[in-house]
Amino acid sequence: MKLAVYGKGGIGKSTTSCNISVALAKRGKKVLQIGCDPKHDSTFTLTGFLIPTIIDTLQEKDYHYEDVWPEDVIYKGFGGVDCVEAGGPPAGAGCGGYVVGETVKLLKELNAFDEYDVILFDVLGDVVCGGFAAPLNYADYCMIVTDNGFDALFAANRIAASVREKARTHPLRLAGLIGNRTSKRDLIDKYIDSVPMPVLEILPLIEDIRVSRVKGKTMFEMAESDPSLEPVCNYYLNIADQILAGPEGVVPEDAQDRELFALLSDFYLNPTQPKTEEEELDLMMV
C-alpha cells in the first residue's frame, strides 16, 4: 500500500506523517517513509537527525545509480520505520519536483518498493506541480492535512483537484482529511458539505505534539517515558486502522476557486449565531 500525505505548508504534515508511520508499524506493518521536500526534515522525528538525502548520495556517486546500495540512502527510524529523504537542488536553482522523480527511480532500481507493506510519501507543502504531484502516480490513497482555517482548506481543495486529475489514469483515491491543531471543525464541515469527502481524524492543538517535533521524537517514543501521552497516540492509531481497513475513499469533485472563496469567506463574514436557550425552548414547544 502506498500513501501520499499533502497539505498547506506548515500545517504539520511531517509530524503527522511520522506518527502515522509509527502507528502503522505498531500494527505489524513494514513501513518506509519518503520525505519529498528540499528541506529534508520529513523524517527528523523518526531518526532524531537530518539524514543524508538521495540527491546528495547520487551527486557523490556522480549519478551512477548502479553504485548506490540501499544502506546508502535508507536509514532506520523509531519503531522500525525505514526513512528516505529525497532532498533537493540548491535554493533558487533547479527543480525540486525533478528530484522526487529521481528518488522514485532510484528506489525502484533498488527494488525497495517491493520490500515494504506500506510506503508513505510526505510531500512538500501545497505545491501540486507535475514534479511534486508525482507521488500521486504511485499512491493508492492520498491524505490531506488541514486545519479549521481558510488558507489550509483552500490549499486542500487544490490538492483535491490534483487527486481528481490523477485518478483519471491511476487507481488513486482520496482517503480523507486529517484536521490538525484544531478543536473546532465547523469550517471543515462547511467545506465537506460542498465537496463531499471523509474526515479521518481531528487532532486538537496539543503542545506536546509541537514539542515532539523540536525534540526529534514521535509521540509514541515520548509516550514510552510518559504514559499520559498514550491517548494522543490513539489519534494516529485510529488513522492507521482506517487506512489498513482499505477505505473506499473518494475521487473528489473540487470546488472552483471563486466558488470556494465565496463559500469560506461567507463563513467569516456571516457567522451563524448560536441559538439562545429561549429560542431552543420555543422550537421544542412548536
UniProtKB/Swiss-Prot annotation:
Record's cofactor remark: Binds 1 [4Fe-4S] cluster per dimer.
GO biological process: light-independent chlorophyll biosynthetic process; photosynthesis, dark reaction
Catalytic class of the enzyme: oxidoreductase
EC identifiers of the protein: 1.3.7.7
PROSITE patterns: NIFH_FRXC_1, NIFH_FRXC_2, NIFH_FRXC_3
Gene3D superfamilies: P-loop containing nucleotide triphosphate hydrolases
Keywords annotated in UniProt: 4Fe-4S, ATP-binding, Chlorophyll biosynthesis, Iron, Iron-sulfur, Magnesium, Metal-binding, Nucleotide-binding, Oxidoreductase, Photosynthesis
Pfam family, one: Fer4_NifH
Metabolic or biological pathway, per its Swiss-Prot or TrEMBL entry: Porphyrin-containing compound metabolism; chlorophyll biosynthesis (light-independent)
Family the UniProt entry places it in: Belongs to the NifH/BchL/ChlL family.
Record function comment: Component of the dark-operative protochlorophyllide reductase (DPOR) that uses Mg-ATP and reduced ferredoxin to reduce ring D of protochlorophyllide (Pchlide) to form chlorophyllide a (Chlide). This reaction is light-independent. The L component serves as a unique electron donor to the NB-component of the complex, and binds Mg-ATP.
The protein, known as: Light-independent protochlorophyllide reductase iron-sulfur ATP-binding protein
Gene: chlL
